[in-house]
A protein has these predicted regions:
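Short, glycine-/small-residue-rich phosphate/pyrophosphate-handling segment
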Residues: 100-141
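Short, solvent-exposed loop/turn segments at secondary-structure boundaries
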Residues: 117-120, 150-155
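Residues in intrinsically disordered, low-complexity segments of regulatory proteins
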Residues: 78-79, 135
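Acidic, low-complexity intrinsically disordered regions
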Residues: 75-76, 132
Length: 169
């Protein structure tokens, strides 16, 4: 799940991960910024039916997430949190939360501050809470500091690390 609307460091990280993972796995990148998904209205109708009542890309997207064996959440840091694009999809997962239990997940977070800054900790905690609530097996959490568009790509150690994580799935 690519939480970035740009083709920058977050996508570079995803592609490095995919390079390692694609040998043994079928992979699809979901790009929320290219989908027509309305924000959750909190209407609660989804709790009595099998999905969201919005006639948009919500249900087909949640179907893909529910069918996946492993979910990678990748996001740039926006104001000490994940991107709005990624958060929108996560909010809409409420409509079928029980179908999303017991997934294997990993996170990649790319930001413009050193990786020991609070922004990464806050995002990790949010994903940890979701993982606990949905009984997810958190396989890995990786954070990277990169501000220039091609900065992460030039960091061979990071690229090798991400490819290795993908290979070891």
């Amino acid at each position: 799940m690519n939480g970035s609307a740009r083709k920058g460091n977050t996508l570079t990280a995803i592609n490095a991960f995919i390079k390692g993972a694609s040998e043994k796995n079928e992979i699809e990148i979901i790009e929320p910024d290219k989908l027509n998904i309305a924000p959750c209205k909190g209407c609660g109708v989804c709790q009595c039916s099998n999905g969201c009542v919005d006639k948009d890309d919500t249900n087909p997207t949640i179907d893909k997430i529910a069918a996946a064996d492993m979910i990678l959440f990748a996001t740039p840091v926006y104001w000490w949190g994940m991107s709005a694009q990624l958060k929108l999809i996560i909010d809409k997962c409420y409509c079928r939360g029980l179908q999303l239990k017991n997934k294997k997940v990993g996170t990649i977070v790319v930001g413009g501050s050193p990786v020991d800054s609070i922004q990464y900790e806050l995002i990790d905690k949010q994903f940890d809470c979701m993982a606990k609530y949905l009984s997810w097996d958190m396989l890995f959490k990786k954070s990277y500091y990169a501000t220039a568009r091609d900065e992460l790509e030039k960091n061979k150690d990071s690229m090798n690390e991400l490819e290795g994580i993908g290979k070891n799935l």
